């Protein structure tokens, strides 16, 4: 079943979102109820993209500089930062082009603008897909390091990590190109949504299992030292908080965008769904926010990486 033409270019739909000041306001629909629409100005969108761009560039530079960080785990973290970097680049590039076109500073033929939009859409979509892939890869790497600790270095070798990374990038580019080409097909939308749900379930299962195992390990240590309750409760709260942050940030930042895709597939003309469609730009902004938060969760918690990051900053300073 084809999707309605008004939603044909999903990632390009941001082009039709008018610039406005940030506020929460009701937007009346001619045939449906009032809608709450959060308008994201181009300036704010551009600032978020630039912050993410700088942050993830520093992560990639720090990992590339320090040979001690050239391990499979940090390779996955570096690729996640690179994916988030591409999300930022595509967002900044698209917003900048729109601002220049709107101001009349950039004159281009409609066909050129359309081709540029398609390139940006493929870049943005492939970076999103690869980002989800690498989040899942990091979860699997951590799972293996905990449950197969003695065999970890024989299972997760640098050569295998490189092959996995190459396969992820190839799959991301191919699937994104197909998605942009067939974005007017419901099957294409649902495939992307199923992929997101699969990554969400994978991460939830792996991290919950890791939390359970670590909690049992902490209980065993506590029993040996005859102080079970305080250690057990304290560690349990810390582990639960970490798990909540990991999965909560992932769901809150990515969930609305994939809800948008789901609703386009199942109710493109329903008034309530149309209200949600109005916030498409907000959903993209949340993905850019995720690109800002990812380094804080996965990269900057490493003492070795923070030390190298300081050296990189001092070099440029």
From Swiss-Prot:
Gene Ontology process terms (BP): adenylate cyclase-activating G protein-coupled receptor signaling pathway
Keywords: Cell membrane, G-protein coupled receptor, Glycoprotein, Membrane, Receptor, Transducer, Transmembrane, Transmembrane helix
Membrane topology category: Multi-pass membrane protein
UniProt entry tagged with the keyword Glycoprotein: yes
Positions bearing carbohydrate: 29
Family matches, as InterPro entries: GPCR_Rhodpsn, GPCR_Rhodpsn_7TM, Melcrt_ACTH_rcpt, MSH_rcpt
Cell membrane in keyword set: yes
Segments of this protein annotated with the region Disordered: 1-23
Side Extracellular, residues: 1-37, 94-118, 184-191, 267-279
GO CC aspect terms: plasma membrane
Residues exposed to the Cytoplasmic side: 64-72, 141-163, 212-240, 301-317
Single annotated GO MF: melanocyte-stimulating hormone receptor activity
Cell compartments where the protein resides: Cell membrane
Membrane-crossing segments per the record: 38-63, 73-93, 119-140, 164-183, 192-211, 241-266, 280-300
Predominant localisation class: membrane
Disulfide bonds listed in the record: none
Biased composition (Polar residues): 1-20
Subunit structure: Interacts with MGRN1, but does not undergo MGRN1-mediated ubiquitination; this interaction competes with GNAS-binding and thus inhibits agonist-induced cAMP production. Interacts with OPN3; the interaction results in a decrease in MC1R-mediated cAMP signaling and ultimately a decrease in melanin production in melanocytes.
Family from the record: Belongs to the G-protein coupled receptor 1 family.
Protein purpose: Receptor for MSH (alpha, beta and gamma) and ACTH. The activity of this receptor is mediated by G proteins which activate adenylate cyclase. Mediates melanogenesis, the production of eumelanin (black/brown) and phaeomelanin (red/yellow), via regulation of cAMP signaling in melanocytes.
Protein name: Melanocyte-stimulating hormone receptor
Gene of this entry: MC1R
């Amino acid at each position: 079943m084809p999707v309605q033409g008004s939603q044909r270019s999903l990632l390009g739909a941001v082009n039709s979102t008018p610039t406005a000041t940030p506020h929460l306001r009701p937007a009346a629909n001619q045939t449906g109820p009032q809608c709450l629409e959060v308008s994201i100005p181009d300036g704010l969108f551009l600032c978020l993209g630039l912050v993410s761009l700088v942050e993830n560039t520093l992560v990639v530079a720090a990992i590339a500089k320090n040979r001690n960080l050239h391990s499979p785990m940090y390779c996955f973290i570096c690729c996640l930062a690179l994916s988030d970097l591409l999300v930022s680049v595509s967002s900044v590039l698209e917003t900048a082009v729109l601002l220049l076109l709107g101001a009349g500073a950039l004159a281009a033929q409609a066909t050129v603008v359309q081709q540029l939009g398609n390139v940006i859409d493929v870049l943005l979509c492939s970076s999103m897909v690869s980002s989800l892939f690498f989040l899942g890869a990091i979860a699997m790497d951590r799972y293996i390091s905990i449950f197969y600790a003695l065999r970890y270095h024989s299972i997760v070798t640098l050569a295998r990590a490189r092959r996995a990374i190459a396969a992820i990038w190839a799959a991301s580019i191919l699937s994104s190109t197909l998605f942009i080409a067939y974005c007017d097909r419901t099957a294409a939308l649902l495939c992307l949504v199923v992929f997101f749900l699969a990554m969400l379930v994978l991460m939830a299962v792996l991290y919950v299992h890791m939390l359970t195992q670590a909690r049992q390990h902490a209980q065993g240590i506590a029993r040996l030292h005859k102080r079970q309750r305080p250690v057990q409760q304290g560690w349990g709260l810390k582990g639960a908080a970490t798990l909540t942050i990991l999965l909560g940030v992932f769901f809150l930042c990515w969930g609305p965008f994939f809800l948008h895709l789901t609703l386009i597939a199942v109710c493109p003309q329903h008034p309530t769904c149309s209200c949600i469609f109005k916030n498409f730009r907000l959903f993209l902004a949340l993905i850019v926010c995720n690109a800002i938060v990812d380094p804080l969760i996965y990269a900057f918690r490493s003492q070795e990486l923070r030390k190298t990051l300081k050296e990189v900053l001092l070099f440029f300073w």
